[in-house]
Design a protein with these regions (language model features):
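Acidic, small-polar-rich N-terminal luminal/periplasmic segments of exported/outer-membrane proteins
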Residues: 32-168, 539
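Transmembrane beta-strands of outer-membrane beta-barrel pores
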Residues: 162, 181-187, 200-202, 211-215, ...
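Periplasmic-side early beta-strands and strand-to-turn transitions of outer-membrane beta-barrels
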Residues: 166, 173-180, 184, 188-291, ...
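Flexible loop and strand-edge segments within Gram-negative outer membrane beta-barrel domains
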Residues: 234-236, 254-311, 325-350, 518
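Outer membrane beta-barrel strand-and-loop segments of large Gram-negative receptors
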Residues: 349-359, 524-530, 536, 543-614, ...
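Structural signature of Gram-negative outer-membrane beta-barrels, strongest in the C-terminal barrel
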Residues: 370, 378, 415-558, 608, ...
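C-terminal beta-signal and adjacent terminal beta-strands/loops
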Residues: 503, 554-561, 565-567, 663, ...
Length: 743
């Protein structure tokens, strides 16, 4: 840990340590005072089989989401979860414990979201296809909990729960709702949303709709115009829509049957002025790109809470669902020098399918040991499709010469991979054993995952410029055990240790993508990839309650068979059936080449005082190394610390938050080594007594207008120089205001 990291570490630890001696003064606090990731050891019962029932999970409520004005994953990591990050650079991905993309999982309403990635055309994203306005809670599960997360959760999971009718219908009422609106100067955006729920006897329904419209994300650049010297952001505008419908039927025997339907759409257009020049291939006003994220989901839901403790099953949940996700990157241009004329592209990658997941808990006793046995399963049958449509002035067939020389590598109106029919199936079992009154709990668990990918030749794929054969199928399986030990020293202090293995199967894109042509370059999939696996250890403690508490976790994880892209040697090309004499500039394919390790520490603490003041602090530090090259992993973010001080009454509150991040290590594989920074945010909220249910939130972010860079957003860019680096900077001072009315 370098000097900058040590300073940040010591400052945050000092704040955490300072909370402890002050605890004696805390008695009777405002009931709605908030804190950074409050740790509650005793409270509402969580089903043993629930994905968040682990000491490695932290919980954020709807109230905290609203008060902290959390509207994105980045907001969550900035104000509440220092170990959660979002990479907007090339991956458009959630990042937990230094892993991102398809190595972390996102689950909403019990349904996993797919991270869509076209490895040939740099299209990626999809796991962020949700709206925070629709959420009732956010849980972050750290590490590979093999008993619940399963395929793709090597780094952890973001578990999202959407509003239920009961969240809006107050006690003694048969209907309720909320409306919200707000403005953010960071991207000149405003949003509006409304949700209403109604109950008739044992039947309840909820409908929610929200809309957001904005422009480009601000930065600290001040050079406008066109070309590579521009540091102001490219002009952009976006629209976001979200719809949610739920129908629930309660029974008097503890069963709840439901129907859920969701529709999410995000669409953005950007004027690429940095790529335009008066005499260049792209002229001013004639070069833009687009981005589209879509997600549709319909599910039948089932919940069960046993009305008494003498039944065989204590609790159960199940979801039968259909889901479709689409990611599209597009280009709308006129070219002037190379391939002159209209140039349009629509690059799509889509996955749709049917799935089922569920579990049940069964409690019983043997001797002096209390057991809660959980059985569960996850099944998903899907089809992945990729297609690139386009319009350009390229001749219908080669040879391509003169201004059309680039046409040899401008492949369009083709599929870069076959349609892929996939099946994923898993079963898991765990037994939470409590040994009398000793406070000791032991939870062994075992999960079995199986996958099968079967490519289907289509006319669009057979028309690929490489004229490929249909590749072979790919299948595999894995056993992932877990052992969790917990020792409750008191009602408010628990020690824990966990060993768990994790698993990620190769994606259809990694297996079967083919893009290129002789004389240019070739990117090709690898149908013989092995799954990635992890072997991790966590030890730590959780203590306290909502008034004074915290957590401390140390973790170490080894990863095997990491999938990375690598250029093939001539001998390797021959072994793959590729002719090196075809004149490829390079041949790149994903291979299982590396082992890696990531270790670190996570801390959180909070304290609330009887005079209305509160303090909180958090820290996330991780270090990751590619053991094949001894180079630091670029996907592992630098140390981040958060220190906050606030004051609250029953009607209003104010918070001052400092976020400090160290600079990227010189040994990192990151192309750009982002320097460290420290920024302040000032936020507040007010609930006027005259208007019941109204809450107004406001905040000033980056209070002192610092210029800083996000390490994950910039790690893959090789063109950053001292002259243009402000184009890649984060927003300066911005403000945000929002209003929520419950009725």
């Amino acid at each position: 840990m370098n000097i900058r990291a040590t300073r940040c570490f010591l400052l945050t630890c000092t704040a955490i340590a300072a909370l402890s001696p002050l605890s004696a003064a805390a008695q009777g606090l405002p009931p709605d005072a908030t804190a950074l990731q409050t740790i509650v050891l005793k409270g509402k019962r969580v089903k043993a089989g629930d994905i968040v029932n682990t000491p490695l999970a932290s919980h954020t409520t709807e109230e905290e989401i609203e008060k902290k004005q959390v509207q994105s994953i980045e907001d969550l990591g900035r104000s509440l979860e220092p170990g959660v990050n979002y990479s907007r650079g090339t991956t458009n991905s959630l990042n937990i414990r230094g892993l991102e993309g398809n190595r972390v999982a996102t689950v909403i309403g019990g349904v996993p979201l797919t991270y869509l990635q076209d490895t040939a055309r740099s299209t990626a994203g999809g796991a962020e296809s949700f709206d925070f306005f629709a959420l009732t809670s956010v849980d972050v599960v750290r590490g590979a909990d093999s008993s619940r997360i399963g395929d793709g959760g090597l780094g952890g999971a973001l578990v999202l729960r959407t509003l239920e009718p009961e969240d809006l219908i107050g006690e003694g009422r048969d209907w309720g709702g909320k409306v919200g609106t707000g403005y953010d100067s960071m991207d000149n955006s405003w949003y509006g949303g409304a949700a209403v729920a109604k109950r008739v006897e044992n039947t309840s329904a909820l409908f929610l709709g929200s809309y957001k419209k904005g422009d480009e994300r601000d930065n600290k650049g001040d050079v406008g115009g066109y070309g590579a010297t521009r540091t102001e952001p490219n002009p952009a505008d976006y629209d976001q829509h979200n719809l949610l419908f739920k129908l629930r039927q309660d029974t008097e025997l503890g069963h709840v049957f439901g129907l859920t339907a969701e529709r999410f759409r995000f669409e953005k257009d950007t004027d690429l002025r940095r790529d335009q020049m008066l005499t260049g291939n792209y002229r001013p006003g004639s070069h833009s790109n687009g981005q589209l994220n879509e997600r549709d989901r319909v599910s039948l839901d089932y919940f069960y809470e046993a009305p008494s403790s003498d039944g065989l099953v204590d609790a159960a949940e199940a979801t039968l669902y259909w889901q479709r996700q689409l990611r599209q990157d597009s280009q709308d241009s006129i070219r002037w020098a190379s391939v002159p004329g209209v140039y349009k592209r629509w690059n799509d990658i889509e996955e749709s399918g049917f799935g089922f997941n569920g579990f049940f808990d069964s409690g019983f006793e043997t001797g002096g040991v209390s057991h809660v046995l959980t059985f569960g399963t996850d099944i998903f049958i899907s089809r992945a499709e990729q297609y690139s449509a386009g319009v350009d002035s390229c001749p219908a067939s080669p040879p391509y010469t003169g201004v059309y020389g680039a046409c040899g590598n401008l492949h369009t109106n083709q599929a870069d991979m076959p349609d892929v029919d996939s099946k994923r199936m898993s079963f898991y079992v765990q037994d939470r054993m409590s040994f009398g009154d000793s406070g000791f709990t032991l939870t062994p668990a075992l999960r079995y995952d199986w996958f099968d990918h079967h490519p289907q030749a289509t006319a669009a794929y057979l028309g690929n410029a490489m004229k490929p054969d249909t590749p072979p199928g790919s299948s595999g399986d894995a056993w992932s055990p877990k052992l969790l030990a917990e020792y409750e020293l008191s009602d408010t202090f628990t020690l824990f240790g966990q060993w768990a293995m994790g698993f990620r199967s190769p994606t259809a894109s990694e297996l079967y993508m083919t893009f290129g042509a002789p004389g240019t370059y070739l990117r090709t999939g690898n149908p013989y990839l092995e799954p990635e696996t992890s072997n991790g250890f966590d030890v730590g403690a959780r203590f306290g309650d909502s008034d004074f508490g915290g957590s401390l976790t140390f973790f170490y994880t080894r990863y095997k068979n990491f999938i990375e892209n690598r250029n093939l040697t001539a001998a390797e090309q021959i072994a793959r059936g590729i002719d090196p004499s075809a004149g490829y500039m390079f041949v790149q394919t994903p291979v299982n080449v590396s082992r890696a390790e990531i270790y670190g520490i996570e801390l959180a603490a909070h304290k609330r005082f009887d005079n209305g003041f509160n303090m909180r602090a958090g820290l996330a530090y991780a270090r990751g190394t590619n053991l094949g090259t001894d180079q630091l992993l670029a996907s592992v973010p630098p140390l981040k610390g958060i220190i906050g001080v606030g004051y609250e009454t029953e009607a209003w509150g104010v918070d001052l938050l400092w976020t400090g991040v160290e600079g990227v290590d010189d040994q990192s594989a990151a192309s750009f080594k982002a320097p460290g920074y420290g920024i302040f945010d000032l936020t507040g909220w007010w609930e006027p007594e005259q208007v019941k249910g109204l809450r107004i939130q406001a905040g000033v972010y980056n209070l002192f207008d610092r210029t800083y860079y996000d390490a994950l957003n910039t790690k893959d860019y090789t063109t950053i120089t001292a002259a243009n680096e402000e184009y890649y900077s984060e927003p300066g001072r911005t403000f945000r205001i929002s209003l929520t009315q419950r009725f």
